[in-house]
Amino acid sequence: ISVVDYIDRAIEWAAKYNIRVLLDLATVPGGQGDSNDSPATPEAVAEWHSSTNGRHVALDVLERLADRYGEAESLLGIELLDTPQMSVRKSLFTMTDGIPAHYLRNFYRDAYELVRSYMPEDKIVVFSSSGHPSEWKHFMRGAKYKNVYMDLHLYHYRDEYALDITSPRGLTTAISRNKRELKEAISTGFPVL
């Protein structure tokens, strides 16, 4: 059974049981650096942006998904890329590993245009905050962008407190961080998942 057959089934079942499906491009050639399979997975690399065809393959897959399912009543929308690791400023002269923010922004704009050409405006288009919600404050704010959501993805297994997450201190720290990130995300003006 192909992946498309499983998606077809999910769309059919969702229609039957009156639920909605959010399709998510979970991985891309070269990797987007999320490695969110399990805490035991080694740190992933984000080489997708520097591969010769990674961007084109991702856009092709998104176009195929939007073309096939964009009009389905049970489709909630499409998430353009799942938790890519974005490169951010570490200090005055250094950046963290990951995909440059300008590359992600350009990809998201191009992907939005592509999927929106197949999907009506009542379907949502979702982009990942990449763990830095405040970096997206003025992004996709023009009138041509309709029904755009930000995915926050509050993960903890890779942060500095992951080993202590079950202790009172670890839980307090995680809750505090979640509140801060959620507040930052809401301040961008996007609906937040």
Task: Describe each PLM feature range.
Residues 1-77, 107-114:
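An active-site-proximal structural segment forming one wall of the substrate-binding cleft
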Residues 60, 67-70, 74-77, 81-193:
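Extracellular glycoside hydrolase catalytic/binding regions
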